[in-house]
Curated annotation (Swiss-Prot):
The keyword DNA damage does not apply. GO terms for cellular component: plasma membrane. The chain crosses the membrane at residues 20-42, 57-79, 100-122, 137-159, 166-188, 198-220, 250-272, 282-304, 325-347, 362-379, 400-422, 427-449. Its main location: membrane. It holds the Pfam family MatE. Multidrug efflux pump. InterPro entries: MATE_fam, MATE_MdtK, MdtK-like. This is Probable multidrug resistance protein NorM. The gene is norM. It is a multi-pass membrane protein. It is found in: Cell inner membrane. GO terms for molecular function: antiporter activity; xenobiotic transmembrane transporter activity. One of its GO terms (biological process) is monoatomic ion transport. It comes from Bordetella bronchiseptica (strain ATCC BAA-588 / NCTC 13252 / RB50).
Length: 460
C-alpha cells in the first residue's frame, strides 16, 4: 500500500473510532450521573442512610457487573456477523435475541441473591441496622437489573451498527427521570409516600426501565434497525446461538467480576486502616472512575471496529482498528494522569471542602492516592483497551485468566502486604492495585501483539 494511501486509511480509522467511541463515553458518563444523583438525594436522608446505600450498592454492583460482562458478548458477535456480511441480518437477529434471553436468565438468580441481601451482609459481619436498611434498599433496586442488562444488549446492537447516539440521548432522559423519581419517592412529593432509601431504589429501577423501553422504541421505530425484526418470535429458543453466546460471554463476565470485586476488597482494606483513609479512598476512586469511562468507551468502540475487520478477514484493518483505539485511550488517560499530578486539590475540592481544617488529613491522603492513581490511569486504560481489542477477536478465555492472576493473584496480595507489612498504609493499597493492573495490561498487550502467532486471526 502506498504511504499516502496508508496514511489516509489510518486517518479514516481514527475518525471512525472517535465517532463511535465518543457517544459511548458520554453514555457511560450519563449512566454514572444516575448513580451520583442517587447519592445526592440519599445524602439528604443522613449519614446512616448513605452508609446503608453504599453497602447495598457494593453488593448490587458485584452481582450486576458479572451480568454486564456476560451480555457484553453481544457487541463482538454482532460486529463479526456484520463484517462477514453473508446472512448478516439473520445472524444479528439471532445474537441479539439470545442476548435478551441471557439478560432474563441471569437476572433470576441475580435478583434472588439481592432479595436476600440483608442475610448476605450479615454473613460478612456488617452492622445489623445498616444491613437491614441496605436489604430493604436492595429489594427495590434489584428490579433495575433485568432492564439494565436488556438495555446493554440493545445498546451493543446499535453500537455495532455504528449508531450509538440514540443510546446517549436516552441515557440523558433517564437522568431526568431518575431525579424526578427520587424527588417524588424519597421525600414523598406530589402526594406519594415518603419512602426514603427504598424510594431511591425504586426511582433507579423505574429510570432503568425507562432506559430499556427507550431503546426498544428506537430499534422498533428507526428504519435502520427495524429491518432486523429483533422482537419477532423473541421467545423462540435458539439453543445453539445461546450456547455460543454464553461461551463467549461467561469469561467476560468473570473478568469483569474479578476487576470490580478487587476494588470492593480494596475498600475493605481501607476500612481496616481507618475512617480518614476510607474517606480519602472513596474520593480518589470516584475521580479515577470518572476518567476510566473514557478508555472504557473507546474500548467498546475497539471491540466493534476490530470485530468488523475480523469478520471481514482483513488483518491489516484489525491492526489499524486496535492501534487507533489504543492511541486514543492512552492519550486521554495521559491527560487525566497529568491533571491528577498537577491539580489534585482542584479535583478533590469537587467532593470535599478543602478550606475546612477538619478535612486536612483526608485532603492530604487523597492527594497522595491521586499521585499513585496517575500511574494507575495509564495501566488501567491499557488493560481495558487491550481487553476490548481482544474481545473483537472473540478472545475472552485467556484474558479472563490474566484478570484473575493480575487482580487477585498479584494486585490484592501486593496491596495488603504493602499496606500492613511494609507500613505504606493507603498508598500501599493503591500501589498494589497499580501493580495488578500493570501486569494485566502487559499480558493483554503481549497477547494482542502475538495475535497472529497464537492463531486468533485464523479463527474468523
Amino acid at each position: 500500500m502506498p504511504r499516502s494511501t496508508a496514511r489516509a486509511a489510518w486517518k479514516r480509522e481514527l475518525a471512525a473510532t472517535l465517532a463511535l467511541g465518543l457517544p459511548l463515553v458520554l453514555t457511560n458518563l450519563a449512566q454514572m450521573a444516575m448513580t451520583v444523583t442517587d447519592v445526592i438525594f440519599i445524602g439528604r436522608l443522613g449519614s446512616q442512610a448513605l452508609a446503608a446505600s453504599a453497602l447495598g450498592a457494593n453488593l448490587f454492583t458485584a452481582i450486576e457487573f458479572f451480568g454486564l460482562g456476560l451480555v457484553a458478548a453481544t457487541a463482538p458477535m454482532v460486529a463479526h456477523a456484520l463484517g462477514r456480511r453473508g446472512n448478516a441480518v439473520r445472524d444479528v437477529r439471532r445474537t441479539v435475541r439470545q442476548g435478551l434471553w441471557t439478560a432474563v436468565i441471569y437476572s433470576v438468580p441475580g435478583c434472588l441473591l439481592l432479595w436476600h441481601g440483608e442475610a448476605i451482609l450479615l454473613a460478612i459481619d456488617q452492622p445489623p441496622e445498616l444491613a437491614a436498611q441496605a436489604g430493604a434498599y436492595l429489594r427495590a433496586l434489584m428490579w433495575a437489573m433485568p432492564p439494565f442488562l436488556g438495555f446493554l444488549v440493545l445498546r451493543s446492537f446499535v453500537a455495532a451498527l455504528q449508531r450509538p447516539r440514540s443510546a446517549f440521548l436516552i441515557a440523558l432522559a433517564a437522568i431526568v427521570l431518575n431525579v424526578f423519581g427520587n424527588w417524588v419517592l424519597v421525600f414523598g412529593n406530589l402526594g406519594a409516600p415518603a419512602l426514603g432509601l427504598v424510594g431511591a431504589g425504586l426511582a433507579s429501577a423505574l429510570a432503568t426501565l425507562g432506559l430499556f423501553l427507550g431503546m426498544v422504541g428506537v430499534v422498533c421505530l428507526d428504519r435502520r434497525f427495524r429491518r432486523y425484526h429483533l422482537f419477532g418470535d423473541v421467545w423462540q429458543p435458539d439453543w445453539q446461538r445461546l450456547a455460543e453466546f454464553w461461551k463467549l460471554g461467561l469469561p467476560i463476565g468473570a473478568a469483569t467480576a474479578f476487576e470490580v470485586t478487587i476494588f470492593n476488597a480494596a475498600a475493605f482494606l481501607m476500612g481496616w486502616l481507618g475512617e480518614p483513609e476510607l474517606a480519602a479512598h472513596a474520593i480518589a476512586i470516584q475521580i479515577a472512575s470518572v476518567t476510566f469511562m473514557i478508555p472504557y468507551g473507546i474500548a467498546q468502540a475497539a471491540t466493534v471496529r476490530v470485530g468488523h475487520a475480523y469478520g471481514a478477514r482483513q488483518p491489516d484493518q484489525v491492526a489499524r482498528a486496535g492501534w487507533c483505539a489504543f492511541s486514543l485511550g492512552i492519550g486521554s488517560m495521559a491527560i487525566a494522569a497529568a491533571l491528577m499530578l498537577l491539580a489534585p486539590g482542584l479535583l478533590v475540592s469537587a467532593f470535599l471542602d478543602i478550606g475546612d481544617p477538619a478535612n486536612a488529613q483526608v485532603l492530604r491522603l487523597a492527594t497522595a492516592y491521586l499521585a499513585v492513581a496517575a500511574l494507575f490511569q495509564i495501566v488501567d486504560g491499557a488493560q481495558v483497551l487491550g481487553a476490548g481489542m481482544l474481545r473483537g477477536l472473540h478472545d475472552t478465555r485467556v484474558p479472563m485468566l490474566y484478570a484473575a492472576l493480575g487482580y487477585w493473584g498479584v494486585g490484592l496480595p501486593s496491596g495488603a502486604a504493602l499496606a500492613f507489612w511494609a507500613g505504606w498504609r493507603g498508598v500501599g493499597v493503591w500501589s498494589g492495585l497499580a501493580i495488578g493492573l500493570a501486569l494485566v495490561a502487559v499480558l493483554m498487550m503481549q497477547r494482542w501483539l502475538r495475535r497472529d502467532r497464537v492463531g486468533l486471526l485464523r479463527r474468523a
